[in-house]
From Swiss-Prot:
Database matches in InterPro entries: Phosphoglycerate_kinase, Phosphoglycerate_kinase_CS, Phosphoglycerate_kinase_N, Phosphoglycerate_kinase_sf
Species of the source: Chlamydia muridarum (strain MoPn / Nigg)
Quaternary structure (record): Monomer.
Annotated ATP binding sites: 207, 299, 330, 357-360
Protein name per UniProt: Phosphoglycerate kinase
The keyword Kinase is annotated on this UniProt entry: yes
Residues bound to substrate: 21-23, 36, 59-62, 119, 154
Annotated EC: 2.7.2.3
GO molecular function: ADP binding; ATP binding; phosphoglycerate kinase activity
GO cellular component, one term: cytosol
Single biological process term from Gene Ontology: gluconeogenesis
Keywords associated with the record: ATP-binding, Cytoplasm, Glycolysis, Kinase, Nucleotide-binding, Transferase
Length: 403
């Protein structure tokens, strides 16, 4: 990695601003999955052992950006963080302003302070509208560390503007280094072949960049989820009322033609679990794609023949990257396809298997096979952008490695 590492810093007795990604799922004030908090602990513990004063910065969800909203407060994170650290972690009720400045001033070496959600301020997501927001955050510390891989594809203040104010003092944390090195080495530089990418999710348009980039890298491209029906319609298949992005049909046709000319095999569903409505998961049936999905019915998951087909492709691959569920995994029985993909990846121990964060990571966790996957990324959109472009804005802006 050609960027400054946390190991290159001399943080003893100094204040270090650490951008973490604590954007975790919360229900009724309880954290449902704390993997992103756990993933940041190596960086936090390393700095604590070196007697640094650590100021943690994170976002949570999508608040309006101009006021405090209790639903998006970082308060539920505090007890989890304290459990891992074994000592009290104060939460500043704001991330900027006099209260935050006082909290930072009182922070002693060897202790941790958590600042409230940076997205409560418009200057985080729209730094051009309020440049002073980044300036105030940067003023707290002597060093900056980015350990928030999952949000480093965004040019937000705490990820992109703040590190620019730390010349030769903006470094990558351990999680960031792990993500970049694993994804870079195993998916971009030297993927073992055959290399298969599995992409799910709803829209072709939101993933067209990464799809076209992958066509020059992969041997097989598996397309499913809502996006799969757009490709099927582009091939003149009858998909009933299934989710189709009409504006994505020309893009799908372009991808299919490029894949043909570049020798990449495209795999699409050959059958589907369909129903009139998704909510209850009742009255579903499996239908062949070739025979068509009738009007009034929608496909909500891949069928058993498609599971067998996709599983065979996975088993014949040496590298597999998966991003996006292949069905509505939140509603049984439409979770079976995604869980089957997760279990197939987990059982293929001889391959390099990478799950690109987001919903796919949630499915792997639900299937109980996270530990059997080579690498589960903490960033969905970030992993896709890294595969597409080979870099992320939040990492490119970090200080260069010392020679």
């Amino acid at each position: 990695m050609d960027k400054l590492s946390i190991k290159d810093l001399s943080p003893e007795g100094k204040k270090v601003l650490v951008r973490v990604d604590f954007n975790v799922p919360i229900k009724d004030g309880k954290i449902l999955d704390d993997v992103r908090i756990r993933s940041a602990m190596p960086t936090i513990n390393y700095l604590l052992k070196r007697d640094a004063a650590i100021i943690l910065v994170s976002h949570l969800g999508r608040p309006k950006g101009d006021m405090f909203e209790e639903a998006y407060s970082l308060a539920p994170i505090v007890p989890v963080l304290e459990g891992y650290l074994g000592h009290h972690v104060p939460l500043s009720p704001d991330c900027v302003g006099e209260v935050a400045r006082q909290a930072v001033a009182q922070l002693s070496p060897g202790r941790v302070l958590l600042l409230e959600n940076v997205r409560f301020h418009r200057g985080e997501e729209h730094p051009e509208e309020d440049p002073s927001f980044a300036v105030e955050l940067a003023a707290y510390a002597d060093f900056y560390v980015n350990d928030a891989f999952g949000t480093s594809h965004r040019k937000h203040a705490s990820v992109y503007r703040v590190p620019q104010m730390f010349p030769d003092r903006a470094a990558a944390g351990f999680l960031m280094e792990k993500e970049l090195e694993f994804l870079g080495q195993h998916l971009l530089v030297e993927p073992k072949r055959p290399f298969t990418a599995i992409l799910g999710g709803a829209k072709v348009s939101s993933k067209i960049g990464v799809i076209e980039a992958l066509l020059s890298r992969v041997d097989n491209l598996v397309l499913a989820g809502g996006m799969g029906y757009t490709f099927l319609k582009a091939m003149n298949q009858q998909v009933g009322n299934s989710l189709v992005e009409e504006t994505g049909i020309p893009l799908a046709k372009r991808v299919l033609e490029k894949a043909r000319t570049q020798g990449v095999k495209i795999y699409l569903p050959v059958d589907a679990k369909v129903a009139r409505r998704c909510e209850t998961g009742e009255d579903w049936q499996e239908l062949s794609i070739q025979e068509g999905i009738p009007e009034g019915f929608s496909g909500f998951d891949i069928g058993s023949k498609t599971i067998a087909l996709f599983s065979e492709v996975i088993q014949d691959s040496a590298t597999v990257f998966w991003n996006g569920p292949v069905g509505v995994y939140e509603v049984p029985p439409f979770d079976q396809g995604s869980k089957a993909i997760a279990q197939c990846l987990a059982s293929h121990s001889s391959a390099v298997t990478v799950v690109g964060g987001g919903d796919a990571a949630a499915v792997v966790a639900l299937a109980g096979c996270t530990s059997q996957i080579s690498h589960v990324s903490t960033g969905g959109g970030a992993s896709l952008e890294f595969l597409e472009k080979g870099y992320l804005p939040g990492t490119e802006i970090l200080s260069p490695a010392r020679s």
